[in-house]
From Swiss-Prot:
Domain of life: Bacteria
Source organism: Mycolicibacterium smegmatis (strain ATCC 700084 / mc(2)155)
Pathway annotation from the record: Phospholipid metabolism; phosphatidylinositol phosphate biosynthesis
Name under which the protein is recorded: Phosphatidylinositol phosphate synthase
GO CC aspect terms: extracellular region; plasma membrane
Catalytic activity as recorded in UniProt: a CDP-1,2-diacyl-sn-glycerol + 1D-myo-inositol 3-phosphate = a 1,2-diacyl-sn-glycero-3-phospho-(1D-myo-inositol-3-phosphate) + CMP + H(+); 1,2-di-(9Z-octadecenoyl)-sn-glycero-3-cytidine-5'-diphosphate + 1D-myo-inositol 3-phosphate = 1,2-di-(9Z-octadecenoyl)-sn-glycero-3-phospho-(1D-myo-inositol-3-phosphate) + CMP + H(+); 1,2-dihexadecanoyl-sn-glycero-3-CDP + 1D-myo-inositol 3-phosphate = 1,2-dihexadecanoyl-sn-glycero-3-phospho-(1D-myo-inositol-3-phosphate) + CMP + H(+)
Lineage, uppermost ranks: Bacteria, Bacillati, Actinomycetota, Actinomycetes, Mycobacteriales
Role played: Catalyzes the conjugation of the 1'-hydroxyl group of D-myo-inositol-3-phosphate (also named L-myo-inositol-1-phosphate) with a lipid tail of cytidine diphosphate diacylglycerol (CDP-DAG), forming phosphatidylinositol phosphate (PIP) and CMP. PIP is a precursor of phosphatidylinositol (PI) which is an essential lipid for mycobacteria required for formation of their cell wall. Is essential to the survival of M.smegmatis.
Length: 222
């Protein structure tokens, strides 16, 4: 992950601390903030992107993605999050990503009538879910499945900037959405392959799935 992202995240963590404390004093919990932020982002993506309001869609989703990150700051103020909170956060991230790409796919198909853009957005939709699943499934098996040239923060930055600029008020740049989605599609496929390779080369990856000592074998699902 880039140093720029790490520096930006560190600054956000510092700035969000007073807001996190205020939210906790108001009786909110990290899980409530996670659910509220995700619901708002999903609604924004599925109502604005499909009708071509890409600028406002990008603004709304960006705002609530940042708001959703507040749950982590709140958890830190409480001394750390819970296992359920981590699972809920990851689940909501997948829902948010899916809504963004689903909304853009709809606009590409029925608003722009662009088969090539539909293909790109569908690739991004599928790979965004599979990339995360590879990591979760690998970790559940005690293997390493992280890394790759692009992760969720970079993915969101690329798609939201591309979408926003394509519908920029007074000076739209329609080509930016096509470029952003194809760059993201290619990078996502590469990341998927990198994670599969990371799992394949992890220590113990080639051990038998069904133990010979009669222990219960792993299932194919985490």
């Amino acid at each position: 992950m880039s140093n720029v992202y790490l520096m930006t995240r560190a600054a956000y963590v510092k700035l969000s601390r007073p807001v996190a404390k205020a939210a906790l004093r108001a009786g909110l919990t990290p899980d409530i903030v996670t659910l509220a932020g995700t619901a708002a982002a999903v609604i924004g993506a599925l109502t604005l992107f499909p009708i071509g309001q890409l600028w406002w869609g990008a603004v709304v989703v960006s705002f609530f993605v940042l708001a959703d990150m507040l749950d982590g700051a709140m958890a830190r103020e409480q001394g750390g999050g819970t296992r359920f909170g981590a699972v809920l956060d990851a689940t909501c991230d997948r829902l948010g990503d899916g809504a963004v790409f689903a909304g853009l796919t709809w606009w590409a198909a029925f608003g722009l009538d662009s088969p090539s853009l539909v293909v790109a957005t569908l690739i991004c939709l599928v790979t965004s879910q599979v990339i995360s699943y590879i990591k979760a499934r690998a970790e559940a098996s005690g293997l390493r499945g992280d890394g790759g040239i692009i992760e969720r923060p970079e993915r969101l930055v690329i798609v939201l900037i591309g979408a926003g600029l394509s519908d920029l008020p007074f000076f739209p740049l329609p080509w930016t959405l096509h470029v952003a989605m194809w760059v993201l599609a290619v990078a996502s496929v590469v990341t998927l392959l990198q994670r599969v390779h990371a799992v394949r080369t992890s220590p113990g990856a080639m051990e038998p799935l069904h133990p010979a000592n009669g222990e219960k074998p792993e299932t194919s699902e985490p």
